[in-house]
């Protein structure tokens, strides 16, 4: 490049890329980094470069809780269990799978509500389906919330049904906050969602998400075992110090 400086390019999503100029960008990049194994492999296929690295550079840290007791009391006057979903209302996040799973769960266990955080192109259709299925009392669309991490304190389970994730920052946040997780393993989720840390769903079917969520809601002992291991994983592998060390090593090697 004209500036004659070393360039490191980190890609944190896992969407397929296209175009001549996009490929050209990578030709003039000294080192390419993918945030997960899936992102790394996508970059290798697109760039035809074998030197693509993987650094999972989403750092998590403890934050101050915002007290949301009053909001929770209004949303959940029956003090039921809360299934949290933090995902945009877009096709790849599969909100209709969430909806179907929660409908099935409610037929077995009505002692919960579901709070779905996120906005997107499917918002109106989701609203219509919730009303059409009579789910408005227990499936609540929360829209986009700036203070989303404060809501994690009130979750009994986090549900993730996404078709494709670069890594899955909401999963890492749940691990740090010791919230039990039910998730698939699509894309970068495979790097962080494993049987010792979460309830893993392999089929992508609403029935499986329902079953695994019900298991966690009814088994606090199992939830405790999973969240303890998940917490140890995230503080070790996703601290700022650990990620900084990996990039520091990369920069040193690049500048030799």
Placement of each model-derived feature along the sequence:
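A conserved mid-protein helix/loop that constitutes part of the nucleotide-sugar donor-binding site
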Residues: 81, 85-107, 121-127, 169-172, ...
């Amino acid at each position: 490049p004209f500036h004659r400086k070393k360039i490191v390019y980190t890609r944190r999503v896992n969407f397929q890329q296209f175009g001549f100029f996009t490929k050209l960008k990578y030709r003039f990049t000294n080192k390419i980094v993918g945030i997960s194994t899936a992102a790394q492999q996508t970059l290798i296929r697109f760039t035809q470069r074998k030197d693509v690295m993987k650094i999972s550079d989403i750092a998590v840290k403890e934050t101050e809780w915002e007290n949301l007791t009053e909001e929770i009391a209004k949303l959940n006057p029956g003090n039921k269990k809360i299934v949290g979903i933090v995902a945009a209302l877009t096709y790849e996040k599969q909100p209709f799978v969430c909806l179907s799973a929660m409908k099935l769960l409610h037929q077995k266990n009505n002692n919960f509500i579901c709070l779905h955080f996120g906005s997107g192109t499917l918002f109106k259709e989701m609203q219509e389906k919730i009303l059409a299925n009579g789910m408005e009392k227990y499936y609540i669309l929360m829209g986009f919330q700036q203070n989303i991490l404060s809501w994690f304190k009130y979750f009994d389970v986090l549900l993730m049904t996404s078709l494709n994730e670069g890594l899955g920052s909401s999963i890492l946040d749940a691990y740090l906050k010791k919230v039990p997780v039910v998730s698939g393993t699509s894309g970068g989720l495979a790097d962080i969602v494993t049987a010792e840390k979460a309830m893993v769903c392999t089929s992508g079917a609403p029935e499986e998400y329902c079953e695994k969520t019900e298991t966690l809601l009814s088994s606090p002992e199992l939830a405790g075992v999973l969240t303890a291991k998940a917490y140890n994983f995230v503080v070790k592998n996703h601290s700022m110090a650990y990620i900084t060390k990996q990039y520091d090593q990369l920069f040193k090697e690049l500048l030799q």
